[in-house]
């Protein structure tokens, strides 16, 4: 009887060990799938970054804007003068007219400076 209980205990212990080993292998395979997904996402992120860098360099190579004369600046000034000379508008003082011309020319120059970047030395 005592031998039978010991053999039953051994069988139970063996089954417990087998179940524990199977359970550990399942969690490892799940972890492997998670790690696989993580590596896949990392690869996609790296590929996206490389594509962004390539696109940025391609756009820099396509930039064809050249420094232009300030001829468009004179168009802005003439447009400002036309606005003040329209009938029905009150006569403005010379200071306001100069302020408008300065504002328009500063806006245009800032746009040119931003679009062209820093001048090369």
Curated annotation (Swiss-Prot):
Keyword Signal set for record: yes
**Which organs or tissues contain this protein?**
Specifically expressed in a bilateral cluster of neurons in the dorsal region of the periventricular hypothalamus. Their axons project through the midbrain and hindbrain and down the spinal cord.
- MF terms in GO: hormone activity; peptide hormone receptor binding
The record, for Pfam families, names: Parathyroid
Q: Residue ranges of region Disordered?
A: 77-97
Provide this UniProt record's keywords sorted from A to Z: Cleavage on pair of basic residues, Hormone, Neuropeptide, Secreted, Signal
- Show the disulfide pairing: none
Q: What induces it?
A: Up-regulated by runx2a.
Q: Write out the propeptide range(s).
A: 25-29
**Top-level taxonomic group:** Eukaryota
Biological process according to GO? adenylate cyclase-activating G protein-coupled receptor signaling pathway; bone mineralization; neuropeptide signaling pathway; osteoblast development; regulation of bone mineralization; regulation of chondrocyte differentiation
A cellular-component GO term for this protein: extracellular region
Q: Where in the cell is it found?
A: Secreted
Annotated signal sequence range: 1-24
Which PANTHER family has this protein been placed in?
PARATHYROID HORMONE-RELATED (PTHR17223), PARATHYROID HORMONE-RELATED PROTEIN (PTHR17223:SF0)
Q: So what does this one do? A: Neuroendocrine peptide which is produced by a subset of neurons in the hypothalamus. Activates the G-protein coupled receptors pth1ra, pth1rb and pth2r with similar affinity. Receptor binding stimulates intracellular cAMP production. Plays a role in bone mineralization by regulating expression of factors involved in phosphate homeostasis. Important for embryonic bone development.
Annotated family: Belongs to the parathyroid hormone family.
Query: How is this protein named in the record?
Result: Parathyroid hormone 4
């Amino acid at each position: 009887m005592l031998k039978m209980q010991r053999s039953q205990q051994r069988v139970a212990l063996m089954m417990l060990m087998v179940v524990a080993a199977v359970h550990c292998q399942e969690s490892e395979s799940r972890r492997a799938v998670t790690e696989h997904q993580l590596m896949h996402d990392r690869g996609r992120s790296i590929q996206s970054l490389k594509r962004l860098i390539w696109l940025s360099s391609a756009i820099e190579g396509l930039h064809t804007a050249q420094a232009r004369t300030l001829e468009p600046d004179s168009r802005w000034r003439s447009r400002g003068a036309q606005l003040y000379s329209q009938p029905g508008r009150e006569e403005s003082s010379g200071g306001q007219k100069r302020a408008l011309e300065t504002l328009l020319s500063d806006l245009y120059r800032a746009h040119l400076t931003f679009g062209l970047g820093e001048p090369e030395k």
